[in-house]
């Protein structure tokens, strides 16, 4: 009985020692946490004598009010804490004491990744902060930039990928989370501007897909390859931009024209084909947005390229009834198309003209497709396709007015299509 009592006393003493040690560790973690947030570098240096700089802090839910409740019991590395909360003095102090900027959290994120994910969103509409709130936001932005500089100056890997299914590089993260100001800084510090993620997309692909003109312009200035194709699909930045701009949302928001023109002005190949043989013009014609189609035609998009399934841009245009109602645009496409192929390799006609309301148009187009053109008409088409909209007025200075009018009188078909 006495042995049992002695053993119980020893166990109680051991448990008490463990509890005491745990409470001391918790107190240490809490003090270091608060010192980092307050940028109290003297206290940070003192506490690091008893806490390894690359060991995570674990805080109880009640130990601090800085983090959200869902995050309070999650371990966090001191350097990650300083980066997330944009505390440049604390970040510098930790790095000077051996903090590893490449240490990763449970989601596979480095310090730089976390910086980008937590980058502040501030307005760019003012030049000088005029209110207290604007000054606070400007200070937050400046602290973020300073933290980024400190990280890069201390060897942060600007090409380290996130250790998850996306495999995003820092540049990909900057595009995803809208941190436009850091793109050029990362590129100047060695970030590979043409790096690909797990989906084989470059940062430019991602910027084009969301029609962010500022990002596109910055990436091109930093050396992005405008004609790089996604290996799985063959899509280029131009094709992605046209796809988004031609969508319902793109039409409603009148978005994307500036992005597409920017890509074309910087050498994007207008007739590049994806793995299915589609060009940007195929995509634009399916969307039916006139301003996009006209822009591609201005840059000499070829209306006669066929997909692997034998579908021309005009075939794509005729797929949708909403497109067919724009007779003027249809006539413009017809006047550039030769030969007129209305069916694909399976012999199927476009779905739009199969609707009962378009049966007269269908018959008219079938007749046109079977009617051979004269040599004169073929020559006029070739001239239009070679010189396009871009150079037609230069051509007007060289040709007799009657001849020029006959070449560019592209609305003659309109009455047949009504």
From Swiss-Prot:
GO cellular component: nucleoplasm
Record has Repeat as a keyword: yes
SMART domains: ANK (SM00248)
Transmembrane segments: none
Chain positions of ANK repeats: 27-57, 74-103, 131-160, 166-195, 199-228, 233-272, 276-305, 309-342
SUPFAM superfamilies noted in UniProt: Ankyrin repeat
Keyword Amino-acid biosynthesis annotated: no
Coiled coil regions, renumbered to chain: none
Annotated S-S bridges: none
Keywords in alphabetical order: ANK repeat, Repeat
Name of the protein described by the UniProt record: Ankyrin repeat domain-containing protein 61
Organism: Rattus norvegicus
């Amino acid at each position: 009985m006495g042995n049992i009592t002695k053993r119980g006393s020893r166990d109680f003493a051991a448990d008490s020692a463990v509890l005491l040690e745990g409470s001391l560790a918790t107190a240490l973690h809490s003090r270091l946490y608060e010192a980092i947030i307050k940028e109290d570098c003297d206290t940070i240096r003192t506490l690091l004598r008893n806490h390894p700089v690359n060991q995570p802090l674990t805080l109880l839910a009640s130990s601090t009010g800085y983090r959200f409740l869902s995050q309070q019991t999650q371990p966090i590395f001191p350097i990650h804490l300083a980066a997330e909360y944009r505390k440049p003095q604390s970040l510098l102090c930790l790095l000077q004491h051996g903090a590893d900027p490449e240490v990763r959290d449970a989601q596979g994120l480095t310090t730089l990744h976390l910086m980008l994910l937590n980058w502040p969103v501030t307005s760019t509409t003012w030049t000088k902060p005029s209110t207290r709130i604007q000054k606070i936001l400007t200070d937050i932005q400046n602290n973020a930039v300073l933290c980024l500089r400190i990280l890069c100056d201390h060897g942060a890997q600007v090409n380290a990928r996130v250790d998850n299914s996306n495999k995003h590089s820092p540049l990909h993260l900057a595009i995803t989370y809208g941190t436009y100001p850091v793109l050029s800084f990362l590129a100047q510090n060695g970030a590979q501007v043409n790096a690909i993620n797990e989906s084989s997309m470059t940062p430019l692909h991602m910027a084009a897909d969301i029609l962010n003109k500022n990002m596109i312009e910055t990436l091109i200035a930093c050396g992005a390859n405008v004609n790089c194709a996604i290996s799985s699909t063959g899509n280029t930045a131009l094709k992605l931009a046209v796809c988004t701009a031609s969508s319902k949302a793109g039409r409603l928001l009148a978005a994307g024209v500036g992005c597409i023109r920017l890509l074309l002005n910087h050498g994007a190949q207008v007739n590049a084909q994806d793995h299915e043989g589609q060009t940007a013009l195929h995509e634009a014609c399916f969307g039916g947005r006139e301003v996009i189609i006209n822009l591609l035609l201005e840059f000499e998009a070829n209306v006669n390229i066929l997909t692997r399934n034998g579908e021309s841009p005009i075939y794509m245009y005729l797929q949708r009834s909403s497109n067919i109602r724009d007779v003027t645009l249809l006539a413009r496409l017809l006047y550039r198309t030769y030969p007129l192929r209305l069916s694909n390799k399976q012999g199927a006609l476009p779905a739009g003209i199969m609707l009962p309301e378009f049966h007269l148009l269908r018959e008219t187009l079938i007749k046109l497709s079977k009617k051979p053109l004269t040599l004169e008409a073929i020559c006029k088409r070739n001239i239009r396709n070679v010189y396009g909209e871009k150079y037609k007025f230069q051509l007007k200075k060289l040709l007799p007015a009657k001849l020029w009018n006959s070449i560019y009188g592209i609305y003659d078909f309109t009455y047949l299509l009504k």
